[in-house]
Amino acid sequence: MTLSAVASAVAFVALALSGAAVPQDAVPAAVQQDEGQAADPSAAPDAARPRTEGIDRSSFRWAQSSDQSWILVASITPTPGWHVYWENPGDSGNAPSFELTLPAGWRAGRTVFPRPEARTLDGSVFYGYSRSVEYLVPVKRVDGVGDDPWSRDNKPDANAAWKVRAKVMACKERCTVSTLVAGGDWPPLAEAGTDVRLNGGSFGGRALPATAASAGIFASLENNTVRIEGPSRGTSTVRFIPAAIPGMQLGVPDGTVAVDGTVNGDRFRVEFTLQSLGQGPGEPAVAGLVLLGNDPSEPCVWLTIPHPLAGPDGAFGANGVGASDQAPPSK
């Protein structure tokens, strides 16, 4: 079943982007320009409507997850030569944000960012996407009503609706921020044939982050040194890129894109020092993404290390803390 049947009921869609074919199972995003003025769909025929600068195509659709959550799929295609961002944009830029309005009893989770490109762009560190990317926002029922929470019979209100308001920065020589808006009846119709595995699966040709525990990766933080070890899964290249954690600063030279690891047989090891730990309520001490191989479709692992207890000399991380429930690798 596709979303084409409900496209006519979408109250928030103002236009389809000029010259861009919109998939039949997707809701095209209404566009508000950088100045905050909504584009007027009646001002010109389809072929003459202006595109959002820096974004060639955008749409929203629904998929289902293997853990029985629904997933809002935000599909963004940058204009050739432009790019959009990962959760840590690198030296400049901003990650996109997705604000969902949902009926009572439903809650949106944290956005899942697929594996990004990690490279130098115009002399700066860049983490993001220069080709089409699909950001995933899981949505779960939290009130426990009904034996089948996905049944349309459990709809709390005949007039219930969903709405998403996304802000997406796209950059080339300069940057623009576009607000993309879409919505429709609740519950939505999910795209047929989707069974997305958020933990270590793939979507849209890009790997989705696995947890350290599921990937068999162990990490420790002792004094100011982070050590990450795990199975290499047949690759000869392993790198670590930092997440956007306030206060966390790696002890690497300016302009370093990623920390390179070493591969020995079927295992890898990444080691680096920290200048400072992550700070703020609920923030981990260290977080980032382990990239196995070089292709966007190859595995990646999301790694977090909680704040350890300070040692007797006041040095942070004096008591090493594992990042997963796996036992430390044997020496």
Predicted feature descriptions by range:
Residues 23-331:
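Extracellular/lumen-exposed scaffold segments
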Residues 1-10:
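Bacterial N-terminal signal peptides that target proteins for export
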Residues 18-19:
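N-terminal signal peptide c-region/cleavage motif recognized by signal peptidases
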